[in-house]
Regions:
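Nucleotide-activated chemistry modules centered on ATP-dependent adenylation/adenylyltransferase
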Residues: 2-400
Length: 400
């Protein structure tokens, strides 16, 4: 009788390394799959493949879904200026969903009996993986050895060593999740709510030779098409270029306190130069190209979109409806946003757009008006005051 097949969502870390070896030893045919949303280098992927086979995997595959991640989610996060708590660009949470979808597809393609991942029982990722697998691969068993057996790091390392696999799984002071849309940093001083991270905890440091630099990001219908005049057809390449520029000034560092899906509070530090610069540039351009109510309702919808992504609700049927609204809102978001970069900070400067509503011939704010007379203005003010005059006419003694 043939062995059962299991696809392991393989990152190369301790938990998934243990999972591959343990399931192999237990008689499973293990298919290791690394879903890459832009966070792995070519060298890291090569090492992952080598280690997967050393651990006993029957097969290994890299599932590159970086561009799919952009087309199906990341661009909508830009359209919606999504920052959780007006701070965190929900990098890890949004990427996990697409990693899980890729793993589920792979499991169905090879006819797997089970899917395994290395999440613990403490965080959000267990929900994102399990929920996606339950929906995308119904009937396929979900295996989570680290969570279900409450394994310690020492137990996993000892098991690997006993079976001839040795790697540097030394518990570092900080843990990092690196992605195309930012790097999250956990551990160390972050566990103390009164402390921030020291300089050495960050992966990116100030390396720019100039004290300040100008960054110009050009958008067409809300999508990046050029950086400092250099055109980009590949949106991922454009994001990487902005990250390279912004990271040289160590821009995008911050710390977010938020609510986990389960309901407890959590604190995470991050560095995200590209997301911070892109979102603020995009927001700046929208201020000049969208109407007041377009901005208002898009802010509400963008917040909902980000919350649903974080809460593992990407597959909720309302999400394509939200994406359609966000896409429609971008039809006039064209032009170049100008930013000024300095070490550890940046500021918005201005925009150059053919759809700039501040260029209206009807008038200039605080200057001359051409679309109405003084009497028109007085009439508008009087009519606009009607609800207040009615209320305070009925309640003349009510004070504010």
């Amino acid at each position: 009788m043939a062995n059962k097949k299991v696809v392991v969502a393989f990152s190369g870390g301790l938990d998934t390394s243990y999972t591959v070896m343990k399931l192999t030893q237990d008689g499973w045919d293990v298919y290791a799959a690394c879903a890459n949303t832009g966070g792995f280098s070519a060298e890291q992927l090569k090492t992952n493949e080598e280690n997967a086979y050393k651990l006993g995997a029957k097969a290994y595959v890299t599932l590159d879904v970086t561009h799919e991640y952009y087309e199906k989610s990341l661009k909508y996060m830009i359209f919606g200026n999504v920052l959780r708590n007006n701070c965190y660009p929900i990098s890890v949470s949004s990427e996990r969903i697409f990693q899980a979808i890729a793993i589920a597809r792979d499991a169905k393609e090879i006819g797997a009996d089970a899917i395994a991942h290395g999440s613990t029982g403490a965080g959000n990722d267990q929900i994102r993986f399990d929920m996606t697998f339950l929906v995308m691969a119904p009937g396929v068993e979900i295996i989570t050895l680290t969570r279900d057996k409450a394994l310690s790091r020492k137990e996993e390392v000892d098991y690997l060593n006993e079976h001839g696999f040795f790697a540097d799984f030394t518990k570092l002071k900080y843990s990092y999740n690196v992605g195309i849309w930012g790097t999250s940093i956990c551990g160390g001083e972050i566990l103390d709510p009164t402390q921030g991270l020291p300089e050495e905890a960050y992966l990116k440091h100030v390396t720019a030779k100039e004290e300040e630099a100008e960054l110009k990001i050009t958008f067409e219908k809300g999508e990046i098409v050029a950086v400092n005049g250099e055109k980009f057809d590949d949106k991922i390449a454009a994001i990487q270029k902005i990250e390279e520029i912004g990271a040289s000034y160590a821009i995008g560092r911050d710390c977010n306190v938020g609510d986990t899906i389960i309901g407890i509070k959590g604190r995470v530090a991050f560095e995200a130069a590209a997301p911070k610069l892109i979102i603020e540039a995009h927001r700046l351009l929208e201020k000049s190209t969208l109407s007041k109510w377009q901005q208002y309702w898009k802010d509400q919808v963008g917040n909902w979109y980000g919350m649903f992504l974080h809460e593992s609700q990407y597959l909720e049927p309302v999400m394509p409806d939200i994406e359609a609204m966000l896409t429609s809102s971008q039809r006039n978001v064209n032009g170049t946003a100008i930013l000024k970069l300095r070490p550890l900070s940046f500021q918005t400067v201005g925009v150059d757009s053919p759809d700039d509503l501040t260029k209206s011939k009807l008038g200039e704010y605080g200057e001359m008006q051409h679309g109405w007379t003084a009497e028109d203005a007085k009439g508008f003010i009087k009519v606009s005051s009607t609800p207040l005059r009615v209320y305070y006419g009925m309640h003349p003694n009510e004070e504010r």
